[in-house]
Regions:
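Short Pro-Cys-Gly-centered "Cys-loop" motif that presents a nucleophilic cysteine in a tight turn
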Residues: 1-56, 65-169
Length: 169
């Protein structure tokens, strides 16, 4: 049975999406870079803030805050659908499923939870043994933040609590 997705106006979400059968289809740096390109394009089409991300070999994590009443499912459908079409074409596939089951999303309820989610996402490559330090993972939001690369992640870390929870400050 498919459960309804929990959605809330103004909320930030921790989103996870896995590759079908846990395959390592996002392994190459070029593919990871192209996924980021589709996220950037989605930001031009739909109003949302990307607070953090981590692209692993078989799944992605995103922290997304839709704006102006935009729909999280619509944003994710666009990113995943367009990236899958690109991936299939690049790999000579006529179709098939790149992504596994539907994406998982959880509303981030407070500042402490936001900080836990950021820590979890940022340290995912370190826990997987891909880097010694979380900040060295080129396909993660922390790497971009620390190097001033604000083309994908556009909100400085210090501003995130106020953006997500304006009444908490």
């Amino acid at each position: 049975m498919r459960y309804p997705r929990e959605l809330k106006d103004g909320a930030a979400y921790h989103v996870t999406s896995e590759i079908n059968r846990n395959e390592m289809e996002l392994q190459s740096p070029q593919i990871k870079t192209m996924f980021l390109t589709f996220v950037k394009r989605a930001k031009q089409k739909y109003p949302f803030q990307l607070l953090d991300f981590c692209i692993m070999d078989n799944h992605v994590h995103l922290v997304i805050k839709p704006e102006n009443g935009e729909s999280l499912p619509r944003i994710m459908q666009w990113i995943k659908g367009n990236f899958a079409r690109y991936w299939n074409k690049a790999h000579g596939k006529k179709g098939g499923h790149l992504w596994g089951k539907r994406f998982f999303s959880k509303i981030i309820d407070d500042i402490r939870q936001l900080l836990r989610v950021l820590d979890y996402i940022d340290n995912n490559p370190k826990r997987a043994g891909l880097v010694k330090r979380a900040e060295d993972w080129e396909f993660g939001g922390l790497y971009h933040h620390l190097r001033g690369r604000m083309d994908v992640v556009t909100i400085p870390r210090a501003a995130m609590p106020e953006l997500c929870f304006p009444s908490a400050g």
